[in-house]
């Protein structure tokens, strides 16, 4: 199955499950959603953007996405590079006077494998009833630059936080973050570097690059190419990409999910990180599940995340 088909398939399953709250409540409209987004873009120097057509996803899911949701594809600047990004949001949250919570989603994969294709932000916006923003890190999708797998590309996440803070419809004190797989590593590094994130969720997150390199033969080439060498040659670079080595520097409340059967990022990484967070007296929750594979969540997990983000 192609990645795009998989993405749409996951969207269909979650949306059709009826787990989500309708956006059809009456509201006092501050400004048309599209006008507000586009005004915010241009006001922040973003001129390369386009509204996305959600009709195909609406037909797939049977949910009124076109009427109730707004989605945009755009490019923003990070270290002089044009970075591809997406915004998805309930129309209601964009049009109300009060700024809303926001969720920055950090995707998994490397280079073009796992690149965002547009449906993800709408998926999370619907699933968690929030404004969702996500980017294809440098060297991924249509973004400029080179993927460094947790190196300078973390700046792309930080600069997305900068952008979200400037959006009038986003509450800068309630910018949350969700990272899956490699996106978990990106999330941990962003939390270490920046204390503006309100709450964070990591699913099947890469927390120890030393362990990942040793335990997955298929990742050795990825690390050598994108990081620049082996753990023996570049221990500082691998430590930078290993939250287990600096858990005491993470101050954002964390919710961590990992399945015992994960064959891409062994659960031992999450267990070690949880132990380090506990020893450092950090606020966190670690939830492990015997069922499911890499990046998978149960309905109960989804509800747990929704409640966690509301706190």
Model-derived features with residue positions:
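C-terminal catalytic histidine-bearing segment of alpha/beta-hydrolase fold enzymes
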Residues: 271, 278-311
């Amino acid at each position: 199955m192609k990645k795009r088909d998989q993405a749409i398939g996951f969207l269909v399953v979650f949306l059709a499950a009826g787990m989500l709250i309708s956006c059809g409540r009456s509201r006092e409209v501050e400004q048309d959603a599209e006008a507000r987004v586009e005004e915010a873009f241009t006001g922040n120097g973003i001129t390369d953007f386009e509204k996305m057509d959600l009709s195909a996803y609406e037909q797939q899911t049977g949910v009124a996405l076109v009427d109730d949701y707004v989605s945009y594809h755009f490019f923003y600047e990070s270290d002089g590079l044009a970075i591809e990004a997406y915004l998805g949001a309930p129309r209601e949250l964009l049009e109300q006077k009060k700024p809303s919570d926001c969720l920055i989603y950090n995707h998994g994969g490397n280079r073009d494998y796992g690149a965002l294709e547009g449906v993800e932000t709408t998926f999370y916006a619907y699933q968690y009833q929030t404004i969702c923003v996500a980017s294809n890190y440098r060297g991924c999708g249509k973004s400029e630059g080179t993927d460094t797998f947790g190196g300078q590309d973390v700046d792309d996440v930080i600069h997305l936080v900068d952008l979200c803070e400037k959006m009038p419809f986003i509450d800068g004190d309630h910018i949350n973050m969700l990272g899956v797989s490699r996106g978990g590593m990106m999330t941990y590094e962003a939390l270490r570097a920046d204390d503006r994130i309100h709450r964070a969720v990591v699913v099947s997150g890469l927390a120890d690059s030393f362990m990942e390199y040793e335990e997955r033969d298929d990742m050795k080439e990825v690390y050598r190419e994108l990081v620049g060498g082996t753990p023996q040659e570049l221990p500082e670079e691998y430590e930078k990409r290993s939250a287990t080595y600096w858990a005491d520097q993470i101050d954002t409340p964390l919710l961590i999910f990992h399945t015992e059967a994960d064959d891409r990022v062994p659960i031992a990484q999450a267990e070690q990180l949880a132990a380090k967070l506990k020893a450092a007296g950090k606020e966190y929750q670690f939830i492990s599940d015997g069922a499911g594979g890499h990046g998978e969540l149960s309905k109960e997990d989804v509800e747990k995340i929704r409640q966690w983000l509301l706190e």
